[in-house]
Amino acid sequence: MKKIVLAYSGGLDTSVILKWLQENYNCEVVVFTADLGQNDDMSAIRQKAAASNVKEIFIEDLKEEFVKDFVFPMFRANTVYEGYYLLGTSIARPLIAKRQIEIAHLTGADAVAHGATGKGNDQIRFEFGYYSCDPNIKVIAPWRQWELTSRNSLIEYAKKHGIDVPLDKASEPPYSIDANLLHTSYEGKSLEDPYIEPDYTMLSKSVIPELASDTPEYIEISFKNGDPHAINNVPLSPANLLQQLNIIGGRHGIGIIDIVENRYIGIKSRGVYETPGGTILLHAHRAIESITLDREAAHLKDEIMPRYAKLIYNGYWWTTERKMLQALIDKSQDKVNGVVRLKLYKGSVMVVGRTSENSLYSHNLASFDSSGNYNHTDAEGFIKINSLRLRNS
């Protein structure tokens, strides 16, 4: 092994992994941190890596690329995994893996490493991404190789090797946290008992609905070709738009869920997720589609969505089948343009209006007071033909 690129967060796990790689492979380690909106102190991460004698440190702001090229395409499909999960962690891994391989090529590294555990989905997502971008890359997964099997053993290793362990880490925080611009997730520790209610003081993006404002807030989101581009008629970049929706949704307790999900490797996992902006976007996008998509096109999208969601959850972002589905989904968005008005109040998102220059909604046809060009007697033949199998079964 000549050189290794490590996906590095500066937390306890990857700080220990950095030292472990240096010791066990006796080669140079390059660190890469993707800024996806997790609000970490990037300068502190750089200093911590430098203190471990790392010469090449890549800390890159990928927020706009993350939202534009990964989050928005996923939301065009109204993607939800197992009815609730908006895939905030899953959708971040393909971008990190892609850029990690690019840095490996740039620096002449012949291996990459990650800090995902041997029980989780992320090891699969990262490594599928690596091999999709470079089939010949060597992959190092320390959690599947070393003898450090607990958080206490990591802390002892860190202390032994002079690695700074923040006080909150040493005192074992109750949850394992993953964050980016789309969501924040909490897993492990007390959440491992699925019957115990979480301590919601852990939340970082939102207040719980009970503590949210007593006054509802109305907002408008504008869409073009299926993607949001403005809030209240103010154009925003993809990352800034999602960030603004997080702020708005967070103060109204939007998008807090507590779920047990089925991991790809077969383990059930309980987690709490905050996705305020994404939850608002999901409601808004479905609303604008409701007046701009033909019925059969809308139903076809609903049929393929679970398959598309499973591909992303299981780490298959770079596959041919995901790209095929994406092409179909993207084509469906050609006329998904317009404005959606929403009412936010104590954890709920209510669509209260939608309008589009491409609207397929006909007031004359829908009205109880007007028939338009619809003849009520035509329904008789329609019913008789479509009920043949029911009357003859």
UniProtKB/Swiss-Prot annotation:
The keyword Cell membrane does not apply. Keywords: Amino-acid biosynthesis, Arginine biosynthesis, ATP-binding, Cytoplasm, Ligase, Nucleotide-binding. It catalyses: L-citrulline + L-aspartate + ATP = 2-(N(omega)-L-arginino)succinate + AMP + diphosphate + H(+). It comes from the Bacteria. Pfam families: Arginosuc_syn_C, Arginosuc_synth. Coiled coil: none annotated. One of its GO terms (molecular function) is argininosuccinate synthase activity. It comes from Ehrlichia chaffeensis (strain ATCC CRL-10679 / Arkansas). L-aspartate binds at residues 117, 121-122. Homotetramer. One of its GO terms (cellular component) is cytoplasm. PANTHER family: ARGININOSUCCINATE SYNTHASE. L-citrulline binds at residues 85, 90, 121, 125, 176, 185, 261, 273. Pathway: Amino-acid biosynthesis; L-arginine biosynthesis; L-arginine from L-ornithine and carbamoyl phosphate: step 2/3. Belongs to the argininosuccinate synthase family. Type 1 subfamily. It is an enzyme of class 6 (ligase). The keyword Cell cycle does not apply. It is found in: Cytoplasm. This is Argininosuccinate synthase. ATP binds at residues 7-15, 34, 115. Its EC number is 6.3.4.5. One of its GO terms (biological process) is L-arginine biosynthetic process. Its main location: cytoplasm.
